A protein has these predicted regions:
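Short acidic-hydrophobic, aromatic-tinged amphipathic segments that line or gate anion-handling sites
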Residues: 219-227, 288-289, 326-331
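N-terminal Rossmann-fold NAD(P) dinucleotide-binding loop
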Residues: 185-186
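NAD(P)H dinucleotide-binding glycine-rich loop of Rossmann-like/cofactor-binding domains
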Residues: 94-174
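A short N-terminal beta-strand-loop micro-motif at the entrance of redox/enzyme domains
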Residues: 9-36, 41
Length: 359
């Protein structure tokens, strides 16, 4: 029977397994076994923003008060009633935190299949696409865990940095990034440093300071306690932390020297959410990645965009292998424990939780 970790939508620290009957496939449907997936702070953000951004709508739970958290990873077709999707086909994509997923297979293009189920029709299309491993430009043998843990985060990093480059970094001479030890921040810093538009400044906790400095993708690294010691040069700010207190202090410190303020994530999802947005400097703007992706698809074409992302991804993957290790959790009990470890911030930034064999 399929097994899912269902989470209280209003208390992410409450999560238990449910088992559901196996439904017979209808014509055109495909059943995937979820083989291996990652758990990162990004998944916790999906839960925090689940109602506002409709993340809970991808894989509805039977109980509307609970949700099935989306995760990224690899799955294998174990049953198919679609003649173009054979049993044994492997794909990378967006799964529920569970043992399997049944999709309504459609829009096959030789490289991927899309879940065209009615409940996903109005949700962002990139999340509905399952890319066959043999045709996946992001896939490399020996880099599966890197892809599981970093690919969706890196795509966000690419869009963040590309958006800034598309606007000439808003005339900033330096780039300040909060939650600098987070994987999305590291990707953005790696790309910004390669762009060479000026110093890349990372802000992190004291406990992650040594790790973040050791990465080499930041020119300057400081702690949250030392924000006010940063040079007040013309700067743009990438808010990965989602901590309103940090944003307030960045804005008040840089004042009119802050040329742009971008909100990306919520790695500090449980901190100071009730504080008001700053009234000093530019109004923070939320990055809606699909808009920039659509713009670049128009500018470069789909193949041109994928080529640029792919080239950057290969470089970043080689870089990530130097500092990222996998903490593999096997079986239901270990996976649930891994979820709580990520939720409560007990995973070192140099480690990624990879889950397998949830049956």
């Amino acid at each position: 029977m399929p097994t899912y970790l269902e989470i209280n939508r209003h208390d992410l620290r409450e999560a238990d397994y449910v088992r559901t009957p196996t439904a017979e496939l209808a014509p055109g449907q495909v059943r995937f076994r979820v083989d291996r997936f990652g758990l990162t702070a990004n998944n916790i953000t999906y839960g925090v923003m689940g109602d506002a951004m409709r993340y809970w709508d991808f894989f509805p739970a039977l109980d509307g008060a609970r949700g099935r958290l989306p995760v990224w990873g690899f799955g294998t077709v174990v049953e198919s009633r679609h003649h173009d999707v054979p049993v044994g086909q492997r794909a990378y994509g967006y799964w529920p935190l569970g043992s399997e997923l049944t999709i309504d297979a459609g829009r096959l293009d030789g490289r991927s299949v899309v879940d065209v189920a009615e409940h996903r029709a109005q949700l962002p299309s990139p999340y509905n696409r399952y890319i066959f491993t043999e045709h996946d430009p992001a896939y490399r043998v020996g880099f599966e865990d890197i892809q599981i843990l970093l690919w969706p985060l890196f795509y966000t990093s690419f869009v963040v940095e590309d958006f800034l480059d598309d606007h000439a970094y808003f005339a900033a001479r330096s780039t300040v990034i909060s939650s600098a030890s987070s994987k999305t921040a590291i990707g953005a810093a790696f790309l910004a440093q390669r762009r060479g538009t000026g110093p890349v400044v990372g802000v992190t906790s004291a406990s992650n300071l040594a790790f973040t400095k050791g990465l080499g993708c930041y020119d300057i690294v400081t702690t949250y306690d030392a924000i006010e010691s940063l040079d007040r040069d013309a700067s743009c700010y990438i808010d990965i932390a989602g901590n309103r207190d940090v944003t307030q202090r960045i804005h008040h410190h840089f004042g009119d020297q802050l040329t742009y303020s971008m909100i990306v994530g919520d790695t500090h999802w449980d901190a100071a959410a009730e504080l008001q947005l700053p009234n000093v400097g530019p109004k923070p703007e939320f990055l809606f990645a699909p808009v920039q992706i659509a713009k670049r698809t128009k500018d470069w074409g789909r193949d041109g965009l994928e080529e640029r992302v792919g080239e950057s991804w290969r470089l970043f993957g080689d870089f990530a292998q130097q500092w990222l290790t996998s903490d593999v959790r096997t079986g239901a009990s270990a996976i649930r424990e891994g979820y709580f470890d990520v939720c409560d911030g007990r995973i070192a930034p140099s480690v990624g939780v990879v889950c397998e064999s949830l049956t």
